[in-house]
Curated annotation (Swiss-Prot):
NCBIfam families: IF-2, small_GTP. Residues 1-185, 200-299 are annotated as: Disordered. Residues 533-536 are annotated as: G4. Keywords: Cytoplasm, GTP-binding, Initiation factor, Nucleotide-binding, Protein biosynthesis. Residues 433-440 are annotated as: G1. It comes from Allorhizobium ampelinum (strain ATCC BAA-846 / DSM 112012 / S4) (Agrobacterium vitis (strain S4)). Its main location: cytoplasm. Residues 424-591 form the tr-type G domain. Residues 151-185 have a biased composition (Basic and acidic residues). Residues 458-462 are annotated as: G2. Residues 569-571 are annotated as: G5. This is Translation initiation factor IF-2.
Length: 926
């Protein structure tokens, strides 16, 4: 008998045939579908693997390779036939098996699987001719050797699996404890809710009158028995140990299965088939879920949870909010109508329906329904007046308090002065008079400066405010322009002043702007001091000036009046001290006082947009003290005072009464002449500013719509009158100059042409101005300003014309000449003569020709003619031919006969009269 070391060798016996030993490989044939009805026979092999434990492999590795002839006593134990599998107990009762026991369990499971698949394989009789085979030899379970690194990796993986298993068990225990605590808390809250519900039922039962029902006793829900935590993992059992008859089968589940899963649908366990139905009694449990933001707000707010909630995120509801929520829930359960709350509704002059409903705490739909019942179809966004709003509010049962939008301005100029804090203040003196009478030169002589040299053309085009000191007393001077275009500036200066100095040139006497200044001073009820200037000239005549002032009710002291007059010379600085003494004397008579401790208010003298400093307003503080950091409202602009600059260019910490300063920090450029006041907060300042801006927009829209009228009126007006406009964009250095230019250009307008100011403002010419001028086909006028680089490039690209001026005379003259070009020329008609038609002839090539005799004047060829029949003009045109006999002539004098033909007209008869005239077009000017 031949014995081989390999399992696959042939063994030969004396009387036996050659056979192959079982190799653990099962073969079979299946039919594979190849498509389109074709099949193919495929051989399928099923191999059976018997894994071994790492301990057996390590024990057998030093002695040589598995399968050698060396003894293998430390190798894996032979696989025994397992006992019949018992029916497993419920899965919940079986402790979870740790991972170290898995190899042995897998061997058992594999053997069981083999036994089920091949039940007759183990009972197959063995050949009796193999007495020399060792039953303890392993049958090739390990197919290859493992290196030391692979063994270390396996050991590390096994250790990590054990650690993970312990951590998972600990985490599951902690989660179970937390779930138990949550369940207890839920049961407690359910009990409280049941008690509250019972109390509500009791209250409802007491309120019921018809059939009172007995109040059910509150039954607390039975507390569920908390489920015990998972037991600790058992120690690994020996690899070859068999399970006891009554013991549960070991579990091979690696992870925790979801709770509530039906055991009937789980299928057989890995240890063996499930014989019966597995029932695990477990109480129903509400799965925990994270709270949403709305649910976090549902808890009651107590002292301990006032800051944060249980998660440390959002604060819970207050007790009042919780009480309101419970009351709302109770009303919804009882279906009680909500109690009507009567409110006091504040109604402005106009209000939208949506805002009115919000102030009444009513639904806008209800208000719309009420209006529909009254026959008014409106939407929530429609604006209604105060009368209709009051009617609606009264109908809904509310009281009404009507206010005006102008109430936001109440109190800002009504601050009362403290009589105990009143102190003397410097007088405010305005220098007024005709242009070129030396007002600015006089002020320069007083201030010992040279402002007039910096003025273009030697005339003042701004209001300048300065403060000088004389004998320890301060005097505030305001210099106003004398040109006719600056009427508003002079009026503004007269309103802000205490004393007016009327400057009259001794060599020029009283002029129109002098008279206007007198009227402004009298309208403002301001005392006048006459300063007769230029007495150093030879042609000076002060007496003539005094006599002319009498005609305008200005009585000087030398003429028996009360008006002080001083003869001065600004050039030679003569009698300037006398003029200042007269000012101080007049101020002493007026007894000027102010309260510096109150909030400041005053007047905006001038405003401009500076490139480096932004909006700069020259203001005159009339009351109180202005300091940096205060919030002021000037016209429709507001801002926080960033800095105060005096007339010398220095920064000051405060500006007292009668002190002129420049204010930096406004949000925009206010209009000259606006009043300013200090307010307590930015919100109040913003509210006042928005109201004034809205009011200005409404006024501008009303003015524009009133001028425009309907579309039909516009078209008919253009067709009838041929009205033309000269669009302009005006930019100046200060707001006062803009006003003067606009006023001067408005005076140039006539019924046929006028200047249309597309935009005007203070500041440099920008690219947006170029775009606006291009869109409106307007010219740009810059007064003491220039265009920046971007604006110049845009003007060259678009072809927009920019004109720069620094003297208002030149500006007005150029605009006047340009507007004159828009005027249609005047049509002037000159009568030439009359001719009477004696006979009408038909000429083949010419048509009808009238044989006429000139009875008055003369008739010229090419002149205009009218055909008059029965004193009615029936045709007007030109002569086509004029012949005397057969010759073309230029004209025919009176008493001679001629032949005439008309252009494109032949309805002529004998006895008609032909009137000849000449038309001339004459260019007009404004």
């Amino acid at each position: 008998m031949t014995d081989s070391k390999d399992d696959k060798t042939l063994s030969v016996t004396g009387k036996k045939t050659l056979t192959l030993k079982p190799t653990g490989v099962n073969q079979g044939t299946v039919r594979q579908d190849m498509g389109r009805g074709r099949t193919k026979a495929v051989v399928v092999e099923t191999r059976k693997r018997r894994p071994t434990r790492p301990e057996d492999e390590r024990a057998g590795q030093p002695q040589g390779r598995v399968g050698d002839d060396a003894p293998a006593t430390a190798a894996a134990a032979p696989v025994q036939t397992p006992a019949p599998v018992q029916a497993p107990a419920p899965v919940a009762a079986a402790p979870q098996a740790p991972r170290p026991a898995a190899p042995a369990q897998r061997v058992q499971q594999t053997n069981q699987y083999s036994q089920q698949r091949h039940p007759g394989q183990q009972n197959r009789p063995q050949a009796s001719s193999q007495p020399s085979r060792q039953p303890d030899r392993p049958r090739g379970a390990v197919l290859h050797d493992l290196s030391a690194s692979e063994m270390d990796a396996r050991r590390r993986a096994l250790a990590e699996a054990q650690v993970r298993e312990v951590e998972d068990a600990k985490r599951r225990a902690e989660e179970e404890v937390r779930r138990q605590a949550e369940e207890v808390e839920r049961q407690r809250l359910a009990a409280l809710e049941a008690i509250r519900q019972a109390e509500e039922d009791k209250a409802r039962a007491l309120e019921a009158k018809n059939a009172p029902e007995p109040v059910a006793e509150p039954v607390a829900p039975v507390a569920e028995t908390p489920r015990a935590a998972d037991p600790a993992p058992r120690a690994p059992s020996p690899a070859g140990a068999k399970p006891a008859a009554g013991a549960p089968a070991p579990s091979f589940v690696r992870g925790r299965k979801p709770e509530g899963e039906d055991d009937e649908n789980r299928g057989p366990a890995r240890g063996g088939p499930v014989r019966g139905k597995v029932v695990r009694p477990e109480p129903a449990k509400v799965p925990a879920r994270p709270k949403t933001e709305d649910e976090r707000r549902r808890g009651k707010l107590t002292v301990t949870t006032a800051a944060v909630d249980e998660d440390g995120n959002a604060r819970g509801r207050s007790l009042s909010a919780m009480r309101r929520r419970q009351e709302k829930f109770r009303r919804s359960q009882m279906q009680e109508p909500r109690e009507k709350v009567m409110r006091e509704v504040v109604l402005p002059e106009t209000i939208t329906i949506q805002e009115l409903s919000q102030r009444m705490s009513e639904r806008a739909v209800d208000v719309i329904k009420y209006l529909m019942k009254e026959g008014q179809m409106m939407k929530p966004g429609d604006v209604i007046d105060a009368d209709l709003a009051e009617l609606i509010a009264t109908e809904f049962g509310h009281t009404v308090k009507r206010v005006s939008e102008s109430d936001v301005e109440e109190g800002i100029f009504d601050v009362k002065d403290d009589a105990g804090e009143m102190v003397s203040r410097p007088p405010v003196v305005t220098i007024m008079g005709h242009v070129d009478h030396g007002k600015t030169s006089l002020l320069d002589a007083i201030r010992q400066t040279s402002v007039v040299s910096g003025e273009a053309g030697g005339i003042t085009q701004h209001i300048g405010a300065y403060q000088v000191e004389q004998n320890g007393h301060k005097i505030t001077f305001i210099d106003t322009p004398g040109h006719a275009a600056f009427t508003a500036m002079r009026a503004r200066g007269a309103q802000a002043t205490d004393i007016a100095i009327l400057v009259v040139a001794a060599d020029d006497s009283v002029m129109p702007q002098t008279i206007e200044s007198i009227h402004h001073a009298k309208a403002a009820n301001v005392p006048i001091i006459v300063a007769i200037n230029k007495i150093d000239k030879h042609e000076a005549n002060p007496e003539k000036v005094r006599q002319q002032l009498l005609q305008h009710e200005v009585f000087v002291e030398s003429m028996g009046g009360e008006v002080l007059d001083v003869e001065v010379s600004a050039k030679n600085k003569l009698n300037l001290d006398k003029l200042l003494e007269a000012v101080l004397l007049q101020a002493e008579i007026l007894d000027l006082k102010a309260d510096p401790s109150r909030t400041a208010e005053g007047l905006v003298i001038e405003a401009q947009l500076d490139r480096g400093r932004g909006s700069v307003a020259t203001v005159l503080v009339q009351k109180g003290t202005l300091r940096p950091g205060q919030i002021i409202v000037a016209g429709d602009q507001w801002g926080r005072v960033r800095a105060l600059v005096n007339d010398k260019g220095g920064h000051v910490k405060e500006a007292g009464p009668a002190m002129p300063v420049e204010v930096l920090g406004l949000s925009g450029t206010p209009a000259a002449g606006d009043k300013f006041a200090v307010v307590e907060s930015e919100a109040r300042a913003r509210e006042i500013s928005e109201y004034r801006q809205r009011l200005a927009r409404d006024k501008a829209a009303a003015r524009q719509s009133g001028q425009r009228g309907s579309l039909e009126q516009m078209m008919s007006k253009l067709q009838d009158t041929g009205f033309k406009e000269f669009p302009l964009v005006i930019k100046a250095d200060v707001q006062g100059s803009v006003e003067a230019i606009v006023a001067a250009l408005d005076k140039l307008g006539t019924d046929e042409v006028r200047a249309r100011i597309v935009h005007s403002g203070a500041g440099a010419i920008t690219e947006s101005d170029i775009s606006l001028a291009e869109a409106s086909n307007a010219a740009i006028i810059g007064f003491n300003v220039r265009a920046n680089v971007q604006a110049r490039a845009a003007s060259e690209r678009t072809g927009t014309e920019i004109r720069y001026y620094n003297i208002i005379y030149d500006l007005v003259d150029d605009v006047k000449a340009a507007m004159s070009g828009l005027l249609s020329p005047e049509r002037r008609e000159t009568f030439l003569g009359n001719a009477e038609i004696l006979e009408v002839f038909n000429i083949t090539k010419t048509g009808k020709v009238a044989g006429c005799r000139v009875v008055e004047g003369k008739v010229e060829r090419g002149a205009g003619v009218r055909l008059v029949r029965d004193n009615v003009v029936i045709h007007e045109g030109k002569l086509k031919t004029l012949k005397r006999f057969k010759d073309e002539v230029a004209d025919v004098p009176m008493g001679q006969e001629c032949g005439m033909a008309f252009e494109n007209y032949e309805d002529i008869r004998a006895g008609d009269t032909i009137e000849c005239f000449r038309v001339e077009h004459i260019t007009r000017t404004l």
